[in-house]
């Protein structure tokens, strides 16, 4: 679910002027990128998983880049050695590397460590019940593992869902720009309708469904037509086996809808 949070922080950095445009080139903020297409990648391509970054998201191979992200002591160095090998903005390819680079970009643009930026601009504004924390790659480097490792509880995750459900507004205050939130909850590519800008999408049962999705089966599911948030922290039971919303999400949606209709 951390990927949605990093995307939200990107929207806030845009609103505050740290990022001038979502069409800005990433290389203007992170100059030492690699690969044939490094100078073409836009900020929004990172958040929409269309950057063309060379990446294997499989965790079964301990030498894959995503596996290394979990145990390496310098995640920034790892990311700066991953090349961009495809033309950006055209093809969806889910990549934790995109999110890690995006949080680094926010740090470079704002001059503020990502966890501090997120806490100040978003987390503290939604009145959380408890503290939360991001994991670091190591004490020596102190890089935030933004691709995965945000730790909170169901009630406070639900608050983040409510923030999106209310188009970025919390208790009358506009925390994130409403147009950005609406754009995030709209398919980014015409030929792939399951992902927006940092948000998973589905039209199950003819409802417009948006969700934050975690690696092990954690979900915050938002259904605007029903003014409904479904939060689930636990292990995934069902997988569709391909890109898109996992099958267990649809089970939780059906169960929740049956409860409110009874």
Predicted regions and their residues:
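Active-site-proximal alpha-helical segments within enzyme catalytic domains
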Residues: 98-105, 146-169, 218-234
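Short, gly/Ser/Thr-rich active-site loops of penicillin-recognizing serine hydrolases
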Residues: 241-262
């Amino acid at each position: 679910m951390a990927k949605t949070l990093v995307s939200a922080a990107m929207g806030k950095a845009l609103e505050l002027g740290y990022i001038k445009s979502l069409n800005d080139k990433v290389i203007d903020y992170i100059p030492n990128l690699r690969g044939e297409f490094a100078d073409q990648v836009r900020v929004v391509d990172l958040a929409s998983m269309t950057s063309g970054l060379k990446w294997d998201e499989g965790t079964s191979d301990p030498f894959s880049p995503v596996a290394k992200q979990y145990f390496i002591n310098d995640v920034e160095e790892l990311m700066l050695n991953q090349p961009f090998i495809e033309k950006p903005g055209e093809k969806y390819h889910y990549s934790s590397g995109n999110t890690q680079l995006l949080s680094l970009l926010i740090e470079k643009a704002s001059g503020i460590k990502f966890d501090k930026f997120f806490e100040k601009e978003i987390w503290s504004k939604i009145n959380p019940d408890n503290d939360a924390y991001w994991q670091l790659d190591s004490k020596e480097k102190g890089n935030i593992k933004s691709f995965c490792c945000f730790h909170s509880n169901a009630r406070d995750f639900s608050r983040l869902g409510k923030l999106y459900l209310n188009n970025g507004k919390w208790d009358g205050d506009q925390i994130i720009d409403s147009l950005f939130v609406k754009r995030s909850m709209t398919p980014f590519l015409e030929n792939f309708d399951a992902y927006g800008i940092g948000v998973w999408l589905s039209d199950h049962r003819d409802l417009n469904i948006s969700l934050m999705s975690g690696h092990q089966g954690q979900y915050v599911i938002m259904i605007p037509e029903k003014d409904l948030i479904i939060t689930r922290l636990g292990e995934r039971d069902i997988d569709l086996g391909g890109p898109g919303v996992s099958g267990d999400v649809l089970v939780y949606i059906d169960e929740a809808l049956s409860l409110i209709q009874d």
